[in-house]
Amino acid sequence: MNILIFGPPGSGKSTQARRITERYGLTYIASGDIIRAEIKARTPLGIEMERYLSRGDLIPDTIVNTLIISKLRRVRENFIMDGYPRTPEQVITLENYLYDHGIKLDVAIDIYITKEESVRRISGRRICSKCGAVYHVEFNPPKVPGKCDICGGELIQRPDDRPEIVEKRYDIYSKNMEPIIKFYQKQGIYVRIDGHGSIDEVWERIRPLLDYIYNQENRR
């Protein structure tokens, strides 16, 4: 089973993608994780990507395509791809690769939330500057404001989590996804999921669909 999952900033797509990975035994390919690993390693590519993200801009397609296709070559089948493709150019690159290697996508899941909800979820996020633990001022606050429960490190807001940057990211995402959504609708594999509510509530909107696809494939 090969899945695409996407959604605006704060939609919870990565949380749901990890649940899907565990339930169906898929390989998790997350563009965000791959990009953050490059940034953390302070590679020349990572430093360049960090500049784009700090401004709320999308990373150029040529860079993202190179990173994702390199990962996909090592996986081939039974994957869930999180956060890719996000532009028409990325769709073309992915579709060409899948066609050349005889790989079929089963479903493209779009977890939708409003811009207001996106800002509320993302701008309240805080990261420990020492250990990387994640908190939220509303949903998961630390015991001591501004301090990590685990190591006592200072909690910071990532530059791309500021409200004005989140709004810009949401607008860019929505604009770029319009043709992508239309493409996968024409392919007959697009499914929009309401991303509002708890993690479990959203999961129960996704699970029956994937159980059906998984069972159908196993009957072949």
Curated annotation (Swiss-Prot):
Say which enzyme class the record assigns.
Answer: transferase
Residues involved in ATP binding: 10-15, 125, 134-135, 197
InterPro entries the record matches:
Adenyl_kin_sub (IPR006259), Adenylat/UMP-CMP_kin (IPR000850), Adenylat_kinase_CS (IPR033690), Adenylate_kinase_lid-dom (IPR007862), P-loop_NTPase (IPR027417)
Positions of the UniProt region annotated as NMP: 30-59
Identify one Pfam family in the record. Answer: ADK
Enumerate the catalysed reactions.
Answer: AMP + ATP = 2 ADP
Q: What is its main location?
A: cytoplasm
**Record-annotated residues binding Zn(2+)?**
128, 131, 148, 151
GO cellular component annotations, sorted alphabetically?
Answer: cytoplasm
Q: Which GO terms describe its molecular function?
A: adenylate kinase activity; ATP binding; zinc ion binding
NCBIfam families xref list = adk (TIGR01351), PRK00279.2-5 (NF001387)
Notes on the domains: Consists of three domains, a large central CORE domain and two small peripheral domains, NMPbind and LID, which undergo movements during catalysis. The LID domain closes over the site of phosphoryl transfer upon ATP binding. Assembling and dissambling the active center during each catalytic cycle provides an effective means to prevent ATP hydrolysis. Some bacteria have evolved a zinc-coordinating structure that stabilizes the LID domain.
Binding partners and assembly: Monomer.
Q: What does this protein do?
A: Catalyzes the reversible transfer of the terminal phosphate group between ATP and AMP. Plays an important role in cellular energy homeostasis and in adenine nucleotide metabolism.
Q: Which family does it belong to?
A: Belongs to the adenylate kinase family.
Can you say what this protein is called? Answer: Adenylate kinase
- Which species does the entry assign this protein to? Pyrococcus abyssi (strain GE5 / Orsay)
Query: What does the organism's lineage look like at the top?
Result: Archaea, Methanobacteriati, Methanobacteriota, Thermococci, Thermococcales
